Amino acid sequence: MNKKSLLAGLLTISSLIFTGSAFANSALLNVSYDVTREFYKDFNPSFVNYWKQKTGETVTINQSHGGSSKQARSVSDGLEADIISMNQAPDIDILYDRAKLIPKDWQKRLPNASSPTNSTTVFLVRKGNPKNIKDWDDLIKPDVSVVIPNPKTSGNGKYSYLAAWGYVIKKGGDDAQAKDFVTKLFKNVPVLDTGGRGATTTFAQREIGDALLTFENEVNLIKKELGDKFDVVYPSTSILAENPIAVVDKFAIKHKNQALAQAYVEYHFSEAGQEIAAQHYLRPSVASVANKYKARFRNIELFSVGDVFGSWTKAQKVHFADGALFDQIYQK
């Protein structure tokens, strides 16, 4: 793939991707986070074919992509998504908290707390790794520039922030040391894009920064297409990023497509759906598929949000609420 076609495909920030026939008699809108575009370009046609064979019905799957937290707020404010697929549970929780669009116990409706896949935060560096970036400590050196999405608008950014904080805690440090470390890290961040794909554009197209912090599936996609320009660095430890999905009941009922929406989310847990996820470097939750693709995913120490921060609710309140620790750190 040449550079022009890559920038038109991988790095294009379009708001909607349409999959299926324009004359479909049923349609779904899946509101998702920024770096699942390529996955859904393959997943959606697979589901469309599956549904056609099962029911004889032709369906259209519409996609909306952006920073996870920003997308979730759009749905809670009235964007009529039938499905929401995010990279953190809080961005689905707010659909209950703010608008009662889903039940409070939405995570109990599907396996693995409604997360068909997971990922982790890794580093993408320029070819040859000229700044010799090997682990988290290297990111706070004064001559290193780091690109991270905005933790206020992006789940990707939240995970990068929490992964850095957790790295210090896992080494035996305390919260004061972790805050100092993360403060130094964000002093090295020249720009905060609203989502993960925007951060990719900043790093890969605008050539800003020595390292990009983003999800494993995103760095492998970039490496696959532009392998002669970048290297992937796996830190010694990182965070487990879960990718939950849910039917947005209120809107699906309104659109009279609840059964279709439920089948769509369940297809993420099917062997076919899990295969597509693994091929896009999303870690499968179904054991048989995970074992098949075991060699594709680096075995590194991963900690969950609950392990270090107690829960997502606590992490959100302490770190990302207005005036909380991230705001204090970034204003310094």
Q: Where are the language model's segments positioned?
A:
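Bacterial N-terminal signal peptides that target proteins for export
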Residues: 1-10
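Alpha-to-beta junction loops
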Residues: 78-84, 143-144, 206-211
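A conserved helix-loop-strand patch within extracytoplasmic ligand-binding domains
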Residues: 96-170
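Ligand-binding pocket segment of bilobal, Venus flytrap-like solute-binding proteins
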Residues: 171-237
